[in-house]
Amino acid sequence: MTDAPALRITVASASHVPALSDLLSTLFAQEAEFVPNHAAQCRGLSLIIENPSIGHLLVAHAGERAVGMVGLLYTISTALGARVALLEDMVVAPTHRGAGIGSGLLRHAIAHARSQGCARVTLLTDETNIGAQRFYARHGFVSSPMKPLRLLLD
């Protein structure tokens, strides 16, 4: 029996965009609110990568293959008087789930947010995704009394 290789997580570059878009398609296919759209996903990923003040994308690698990702988008909380992060698009390839990659990505994302001066990390999950809610609770996340609302702009 051989040990699994150490989890390698890097900040995404432009060369990661196609693989990250594939991971997003997996995620969006299982979320109630989104539909996979490769062109839109590539545009969004590229906007983040090209503008690090907006956020960072972190990539988990198995060898040379991207097998997981998570995004951190930055804003300011006037309540905290500090920079905060919105954690988005956390996904691990189905073939690599259950191996600790998600936990490693999340720990790395939290540490990365701290290193960027963030005072809080906020995330959203599907209301019915109890497994994800339990996963995040195991990592210290708690429910918020705030309810997200959206307005799509043309």
Regions found by a protein language model. Name each.
Residues A113-L124:
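Conserved GNAT acetyl-CoA-binding A-motif
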Residues V59, R65-Y74, L86, V91:
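Conserved beta-strand in the GNAT
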Residues T75-L87, R97, S144-P145:
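A conserved beta-turn-beta hairpin within the catalytic core of GNAT-like acetyltransferases
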Residues R8-L20:
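A short beta-loop-alpha structural element at the N-terminal edge
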Residues L123-A132, R150, D154:
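Conserved beta-strand-loop-alpha-helix junction that forms the acyl-donor binding cleft
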Residues D22-L47:
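Conserved GNAT-fold acetyl-CoA-binding loop/helix
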Residues L47-V59, L86:
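A short helix-loop-beta-strand connector motif used in the catalytic cores of GNAT acetyltransferases and
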Residues V92, G98-A111, R138:
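Conserved acetyl-CoA-binding loop-helix of GNAT-fold acetyltransferases
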